[in-house]
Amino acid sequence: MNKQRGTFSEVSLAQDPKRQQRKPKGNKSSISGTEQEIFQVELNLQNPSLNHQGIDKIYDCQGLLPPPEKLTAEVLGIICIVLMATVLKTIVLIPFLEQNNFSPNTRTQKARHCGHCPEEWITYSNSCYYIGKERRTWEESLLACTSKNSSLLSIDNEEEMKFLASILPSSWIGVFRNSSHHPWVTINGLAFKHKIKDSDNAELNCAVLQVNRLKSAQCGSSMIYHCKHKL
């Protein structure tokens, strides 16, 4: 009887294979979860760009700092923009200033060698200037300039006087008077309107340009002279 029961049990198990495949519910859910995690990792490895975008979105949503690479790129971008703005400003602004005579070296640029002036002469506005090195009396200086087809230095306006005083040493100018009782006149016989210092001294009857001012001096003194020739 016992042998029959044992045989029946073995036959029942053989005829019902589904019982052998049945597993506890707990094991089924555990295996399923593990398979899902493996599948998710494989997706992440296959799509690194999507994963990186997801991280950026997480940083943006949570208000956290971006990665160092992103900060470096942003800083370099700002530096490039500043440099480009500086270059554009230089390219546009400098020609504008030069065209409108705002350059600090405007006066120096006006005093340049010109093709219409003899060699070693400079030009300013519409005149050529000879820079003398010899010391002579006022009358000798007048004759020396005449031999150069020019006249002893003359002053037409305040701007010219300031310019010449800034680049030339003290020198005779073509202005004199016969005595302290006579007015100052140019070598062309025209009245000279600019103020000359020490005019009360009767022995000082020739004019000198000296550091942004005009001063009277003895005509027989030896001084440097400069000549002027109008174009």
From Swiss-Prot:
Keywords: Adaptive immunity, Cell membrane, Disulfide bond, Glycoprotein, Immunity, Innate immunity, Lectin, Membrane, Receptor, Signal-anchor, Transmembrane, Transmembrane helix. GO terms for cellular component: external side of plasma membrane; plasma membrane; receptor complex. It comes from the Eukaryota. Its main location: membrane. Changing N2S: In allele NKG2-C*02. It is found in: Cell membrane. Residues 1-12 have a biased composition (Polar residues). GO terms for biological process: adaptive immune response; cellular defense response; natural killer cell mediated immunity; positive regulation of natural killer cell degranulation; positive regulation of natural killer cell mediated cytotoxicity; regulation of natural killer cell activation; signal transduction; stimulatory C-type lectin receptor signaling pathway. The chain crosses the membrane at residues 71-93. It is a single-pass type II membrane protein. Residues 1-70 are cytoplasmic. Residues 116-229 form the C-type lectin domain. PROSITE patterns: C_TYPE_LECTIN_2 (PS50041). One of its GO terms (molecular function) is transmembrane signaling receptor activity. Gene3D superfamilies: Mannose-Binding Protein A, subunit A, YojJ-like. Changing K89L: Impairs the expression of KLRD1-KLRC2 on the cell surface. The keyword Manganese does not apply. Expressed in NK cell subsets, in particular in adaptive CD57-positive NK cells (at protein level). Expressed in terminally differentiated cytotoxic gamma-delta T cells (at protein level). Expressed in alpha-beta T cells subsets (at protein level). KLRD1-KLRC1 and KLRD1-KLRC2 are differentially expressed within NK and T cell populations, with only minor subsets expressing both receptor complexes (at protein level). Glycans are attached at N100, N149, N178. Pfam families: Lectin_C. The keyword Methyltransferase does not apply. SUPFAM superfamilies: C-type lectin-like. Residues 94-231 are extracellular. Heterodimer with KLRD1; disulfide-linked. KLRD1-KLRC2 receptor complex interacts with TYROBP homodimer; this interaction is necessary for the expression on the cell surface. KLRD1-KLRC2 receptor complex can bind with low affinity to HLA-E loaded with self-peptides derived from the signal sequence of classical MHC class Ia. This is NKG2-C type II integral membrane protein. The gene is KLRC2.
